[in-house]
Amino acid sequence: MCKSLCRSVHGVSEANLTQVNNYHLLHRELAAEDPWRLDANAFEQERHSQMLRLSLSQGPITNALEVGCAAGAFTEKLAPYCKRLTVIDVVPRAIARTRQRMKESSHINWIVADVRQFSTQQLFDLIVVAEVLYYLEDVAAIRTAVHNLVSMLAPSGHMVFGSAIDANCRRWGHVAGAETVIAMLNETLIEVERLYCRGASVNEDCLLSRFQKSTT
């Protein structure tokens, strides 16, 4: 988790600078052996355990999409339960690290892409997007990403969303967090379950929610 504040310089908007800074920050963090301590930290392990439980709540997964893979800690847990899995991340290093970690898995499709522009003919029965959307530069960009993801969810499909709460995200310099995105998702999807994970540090919090798309 990080703070990324910036000002307008040489005619470049503050929002665009924030997006560029966030990208470089993610790239730099991913050079660490265990980025964000996703493999070693007890809070992250519990968060991933709950994310997996929510992901598997409807049984076997035919076609899943994971948005934002970091270094593959959650991908490694989810992949064995998916017949097909597409993993996208805007940072090439994230895809490269996770692909190396999962090199024995032939059923995964790896794509470097921005969640707002990613497009496919496929519909997914599960979409997982956690600790990703607050890196976008403004609420309009988050809404664009949400709309794009919902459009790729199959009828009766499920979305598992996770994020730090609004207050923490704003304290780190981001525009919005969990409550803002959950409100957007509730405009078009049905919220089925919500839970809150909290660790020992003030920075260790995550609101997780599972949504279902209507069949009509």
Curated annotation (Swiss-Prot):
Family annotation (SUPFAM superfamilies): S-adenosyl-L-methionine-dependent methyltransferases (SSF53335)
GO molecular-function terms, A-Z: S-adenosylmethionine-dependent methyltransferase activity
CDD domains in UniProt: AdoMet_MTases
Keywords on record: Methyltransferase, Nodulation, Plasmid, Transferase
This enzyme's EC code(s): 2.1.1.-
Record's keyword annotation contains Methyltransferase: yes
Coiled coil: none
Keyword check for Repeat: no
GO biological process terms on file: methylation; oligosaccharide biosynthetic process
Primary role: SAM-utilizing methyltransferase involved in nod factor synthesis.
Family from the record: Belongs to the NodS family.
Record protein name field: Nodulation protein S
Gene source species: Sinorhizobium fredii (strain NBRC 101917 / NGR234)
